[in-house]
């Protein structure tokens, strides 16, 4: 288990998990109040 491939795979997994968690936080957490909704702005 002390191979470079193991550490690289672990690093990529943690990176992917971090990016996913941050995007969920931005999309649904407190910062989501600052996001604009283009469908709400559009008048028919």
From Swiss-Prot:
GO terms for cellular component: chloroplast thylakoid membrane. It holds the Pfam family PsbN. It is a single-pass membrane protein. The chain crosses the membrane at residues 7-29. InterPro entries: PSII_PsbN (IPR003398). It is found in: Plastid, Chloroplast thylakoid membrane. One of its GO terms (biological process) is photosynthesis. Belongs to the PsbN family. May play a role in photosystem I and II biogenesis. PANTHER family: PROTEIN PSBN (PTHR35326:SF3). This is Protein PsbN. It comes from Pleurastrum terricola.
């Amino acid at each position: 288990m002390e191979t470079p491939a193991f550490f690289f795979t672990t690093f990529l997994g943690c990176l992917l998990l971090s990016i996913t968690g941050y995007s969920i936080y931005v999309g649904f957490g407190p910062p989501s109040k600052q996001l604009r909704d283009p469908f709400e702005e559009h008048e028919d």
